[in-house]
Amino acid sequence: MRTGISLYFASGYEANAEVVAKAQAAGCHYAFTSLQIPEEEGIDYRTEARRLLELCKKAEINLIADVSPATLSKLGVQKFDELAELGITYVRLDFGFDATETVELSRKFHVVFNASTITKDDISAWQAAGADFTRFAACHNYYPKSYTGLSLERVAQINARLSALGFQIFSFVPGEIFRGPLYEGLPTVEEHRGLSGDALVQAMLALYDADSDVVFIGDPDVTESTWKRIGQLERNCIELKTELKPGFEYLYDRLQTDRPDSSSYIIRSQESRLWKDAPVYDANPSTWETAATGAILVSSKAYGRYAGELSIARGLLELDARDNVAGNICEEDRAFLPYIHSGRGFRFIRR
């Protein structure tokens, strides 16, 4: 799962450098910036943009620049070709480019368009001009004003259409340190506005499930605990606070992944049956008749070749006598369970 940050010239070089350092530590490889923000007056883009580009280059972060022919002069360049020399690898194009020009630019850069405004006619024109859509990206807007954002359902519909063509998809969630002038967060999806902490990270996971390839923090920064979670997304390993019973502590701190043929009822560990150092127990029937959401189950010897397999209940299940109850996911982390599926990773940690 890929994540990104947003950098604003009005924040100042030092603040941006601090955010880039946090992003690099978390494993982020994308940043978005714009040269067309009305509130950013008095910025020496020729100097500041080059400093920002150098900062991102050293951190191995791809900078996506929102540019137009009119903004080239702000950077002190004459042609788009010169942007590549500055280290810009993605350019967001909104207006002023015909299909032939767009396809030509896509041979030098990844070209990025507003995801909500790409039409069937645009697609046809680019195809006729010889477009390779793996060089194209669709970036959703963020929406500073309340009640102007999209629904998650609408985002998923747009993404499914463009992803099928080969487009890379970008979207935004709000940060926790807001940007003015409204200070209401910068999400793509309206229902994500105002979220923070783990709920914000779960919003990012919802956007990945809606076919987003990279999810950016729209505002300038997030808290330290959220940065930690962002690092987990980049490593494809969600940490789950867990209480394990005696004899099952061996399950702590092991990387596991849900099977690609994901079950709607349980998270099914691919790795657990392969651990050579893991004990396999006889059945120890529980007095419980059901397993609640977040129950951690380990198959006993009575399951034959499935012995040792770990699963996590996604909801209330009838408990099989051949399964031993090893512990539970702590209540505060159970909201992550719907997003752990189809090869996504997890790790049990102590509360």
Regions found by a protein language model. Give the residues of each.
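C-terminal functional modules
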Residues: 245-351
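Electropositive, surface-exposed helix/loop patches at the edges of structured domains
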Residues: 65-82, 98-103, 132, 150-157, ...
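Catalytic alpha/beta core domains of metabolic enzymes, predominantly
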Residues: 116-246
